[in-house]
C-alpha cells in the first residue's frame, strides 16, 4: 500500500537512524522556515532523540539551514550545500528579485557588493551573528536597512554561497560565512547533481510522481524529467489510483505499517513535499491542514493518513497537547496518542501532561 511504503521511506515507521545528520542526509532536505518545528521534524523521525541533540548537530555545522531548492529555508547536511546551491540558487534569486521589485525594494549591484564586503568583515573569524546584529553592524557602517531589506539581502547572499546558518544565540538562528563553516567538498557536474537530487528524493519520499518531484525540487519539468531518466535503473513504476508513481528500488514493496501515530510539525515533509496530497488525506480536509496562502499547520498522522490537528499548551506546569480530529467519529488509540505526546514532551525536555 502506498502509505505503508511512504511511512517507511520517511522514517516515520521502523526508523533506521539515530543521528540528525544521518536523517537529514537521507531526506535530502527538510523544510525549515518554522525553526523549532523543523527540529521536531528531524527528531520525530529518529529512533530516539532530543532537542539538545538536534541543536548540537546544528551548532557543529553537521546540519545547515539555508534557502535552497525552493524560495524557503531547508535543513540540509553540509556536504550537500554547494551542489544544491548550484542547482537551485539562480531560481531562488529570480523569485526573490521579482518579489522585491513588487515591493519596490530592489538592491543595486553597488549596494550588494558593498554589503557583501561588510558581511565578510562582520562574520570573518568564524563569527555567528543574528539578523538583528547584522542590521546593527550595517547601521554602524552607515548602511541603512530595515527588516525586509536585510532579509532580502541575506537570502541573496545565501543563494550566492556567501553565508549559511551559524551557531544559535539565545535560541535565535544566526548567519556565518559558508567558506569558514563548510570545508571544501568535491564538486559535482550538473548531471551528477541532478542524479543525486533525484536519488535523495525518491529514496526518502517514495512512492512519488514526477509532478511531486518537480514541486519539491523546484526544477523545471524538463530538467526534473531528465534527472529521473538519469536514475531510471534505480526506479520502479506502479499505478496507484490510475496514476503512475516512481518507487526507489530500495523500498519495501511489501511494507505493512500498523499502530503508527505521530504529531507531525507544521510544514512536515510527509505532506508538503508532494504536489498531490489527496493520497494521504481527503480533499475536503485540506483547508484544515494548510490554507490558500501556503501556511501549513501541525497535523496528526495515523496509519499513513492525516487525520487531525494538534497544538501545544505550555501555560501549565506540564506541557499538554490539544488535539482535534477531522472526523470526530474516528477513535484514535489512546495508548498510541499518549506515546506520541510523551515523546514530544521528552524531546523538548518537558514534563508531559498528556492531552486534552
Language-model features and meaning:
Residues 57, 130-139, 157, 210-214, ...:
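A short acidic, leucine-rich amphipathic alpha-helix
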Residues 1-129, 136-146, 320:
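Phosphate-backbone binding and catalysis cores of DNA-processing enzymes
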Residues 230, 234-285:
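Non-catalytic regulatory appendages
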Residues 147-225:
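Loop-centered beta-sheet repeat module
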Residues 59-68, 72-73, 158-168, 232-240, ...:
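A short, conserved structural fragment
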Residues 84-100, 179-200, 204, 260-266, ...:
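Short, amphipathic alpha-helical interaction segments positioned at domain boundaries
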Residues 110-127, 190-207, 228:
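Positively charged, polyanion-binding regions of nucleic-acid-associated proteins
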Residues 283, 290-296, 300-356:
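Glycine-rich, small/acidic residue-mixed loop/short-helix segments
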Amino acid at each position: 500500500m502506498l502509505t505503508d511504503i511512504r511511512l517507511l521511506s520517511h522514517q516515520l515507521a521502523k526508523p533506521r537512524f539515530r543521528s540528525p545528520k544521518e536523517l537529514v542526509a537521507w531526506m535530502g532536505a527538510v523544510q525549515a522556515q518554522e525553526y523549532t518545528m523543523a527540529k521536531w521534524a528531524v527528531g520525530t523521525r529518529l529512533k530516539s532523540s532530543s532537542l539538545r541533540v538536534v541543536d548540537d548537530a546544528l551548532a557543529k555545522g553537521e546540519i545547515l539551514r539555508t534557502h535552497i531548492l525552493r524560495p524557503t529555508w531547508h535543513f540540509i547536511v553540509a556536504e550537500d550545500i554547494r551542489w544544491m546551491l548550484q542547482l537551485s540558487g539562480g531560481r531562488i534569486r529570480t523569485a526573490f528579485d521579482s518579489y522585491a521589485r513588487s515591493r519596490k525594494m530592489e538592491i543595486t549591484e553597488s549596494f550588494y557588493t558593498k554589503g557583501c564586503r561588510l558581511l565578510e568583515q562582520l562574520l570573518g573569524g568564524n563569527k555567528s551573528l543574528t539578523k538583528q546584529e547584522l542590521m546593527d553592524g550595517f547601521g554602524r557602517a552607515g548602511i541603512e536597512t530595515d527588516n525586509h531589506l536585510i532579509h532580502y539581502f541575506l537570502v541573496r547572499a545565501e543563494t550566492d554561497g556567501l553565508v549559511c546558518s551559524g551557531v544559535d544565540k539565545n535560541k535565535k538562528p544566526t548567519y556565518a560565512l559558508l567558506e569558514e563553516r563548510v570545508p571544501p567538498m568535491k564538486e559535482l557536474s550538473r548531471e551528477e547533481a541532478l542524479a543525486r537530487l533525484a536519488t535523495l528524493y525518491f529514496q526518502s519520499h517514495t512512492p512519488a510522481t514526477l509532478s511531486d518531484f518537480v514541486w519539491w525540487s523546484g526544477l523545471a519539468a524538463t530538467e526534473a524529467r531528465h534527472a529521473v531518466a538519469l536514475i531510471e535503473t534505480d526506479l520502479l513504476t506502479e499505478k496507484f489510483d490510475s496514476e503512475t508513481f516512481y518507487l526507489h528500488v530500495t523500498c519495501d514493496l511489501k511494507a505493512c505499517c500498523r499502530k503508527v501515530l505521530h504529531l507531525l510539525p507544521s510544514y512536515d515533509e510527509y505532506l508538503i513535499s508532494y504536489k498531490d496530497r489527496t493520497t494521504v488525506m481527503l480533499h475536503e480536509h485540506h483547508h484544515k491542514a494548510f490554507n490558500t496562502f501556503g501556511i501549513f499547520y501541525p497535523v496528526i498522522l495515523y496509519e499513513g493518513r492525516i487525520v487531525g490537528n494538534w497544538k501545544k499548551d505550555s501555560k501549565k506546569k506540564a506541557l499538554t497537547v490539544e488535539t482535534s480530529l477531522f472526523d470526530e467519529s474516528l477513535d484514535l488509540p489512546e495508548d498510541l496518542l499518549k506515546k506520541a505526546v510523551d515523546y514530544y514532551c521528552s524531546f523538548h525536555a518537558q514534563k508531559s501532561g498528556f492531552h486534552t
